[in-house]
């Protein structure tokens, strides 16, 4: 097949090939070029990245979907994203109500068979946060 898919169907292709025995400085090539250069006994390179690509790519899919859902439902635009975190800025009087909705939207961004719990913290700045 030559690719893996994330939870939302994005593909990461693994279509570079090289000789069975790796050589320092080797540049993997597309299949036809690899066969021409090294003969018919070539192997697909970088497949060790495939498993992690599914996990990390699916996490990115979930985060992107959550960001869009949060914006569409609340109008909140995240100030910053860090890996699997959304940093949002809200007026003091609306924080708790907005937080409950943001958490719900993040947990339900993509329906899964297992729960996806979220943690939340509130603070005046990133150095002064308390768990909620």
Q: What is the role of each PLM region?
A:
Residues 1-132:
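Conserved catalytic core of nucleotide polymerization and phosphodiester-bond processing enzymes
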